[in-house]
Amino acid sequence: MLNQERTFTPSEAAVVSGVPVKTVHREIDEGPLKPKRRRPGSKRTLREQDLFYLAVAKGLDTRLVQLTSEGKDKLHDAIIVYWRSRKPAKKELPLFGGRLLLDLKLVLEEVRSRLERLERARAMVVEDPEIRGGEPCIRGTRIGVYEVASMLEHGAAEEEILEGYSSLKREQLELAKIFAQAYPRKGRPPRHPWHQTPWREISRSETLR
């Protein structure tokens, strides 16, 4: 069921739809996506059906299908109708006179699965002024979520991180990556005393407050 109230930033939309952030901005700038603004001067945001459109468009083979601006509008409109259906009756949807057949049910399931993982990532992270001065940490620990994501980005093996941070579970590593992609850290990352040492669980005496 379509959530008319829920909106997403371009970074959130990129994670859920599985496309680069620059693609999200291009589809906004060139159409057919029409962003909402929560308030004057705020960042532009997208609706759930827009994420579905991005995921569908990503799956089109550009060697076979080149959509014009009008074609993108028609595809977006068809996707909204399908998305609003409580129980979509068709697995595949014919478009443009039957010349294009899309497996929208599969894409819908993938988008909702990614959205669920994003929600789990959000729920996993806590920002408490009493814990490292409000640094986003993995719930139940004093481990910064951006630190874990950075380790993975720079090639650290999951086994190495799990050995050094025994309180973490493997799923939390994947969720940390998702969170960092959806909510990029602003500004220059802070320096921490354990950056020059192998990955390990930090003690309270080492923790920045």
List the predicted regions and their residue ranges.
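Basic Lys/Arg-rich amphipathic helical interaction modules
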Residues: 1-5, 58-129, 133-139, 143, ...
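Polyanion-binding surface elements
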Residues: 2-23
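Helix-turn-helix-like N-terminal two-helix hairpins of bacterial/phage DNA-binding regulators
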Residues: 7, 21, 30-36, 43
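Pre-recognition alpha-helix immediately N-terminal to the DNA-recognition helix
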Residues: 23, 52, 144-147
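Helix-turn-helix DNA-binding helix
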Residues: 24-25, 173
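DNA major-groove recognition helix of helix-turn-helix
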Residues: 27-29, 50, 152, 177
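Short helix-start
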Residues: 34-59
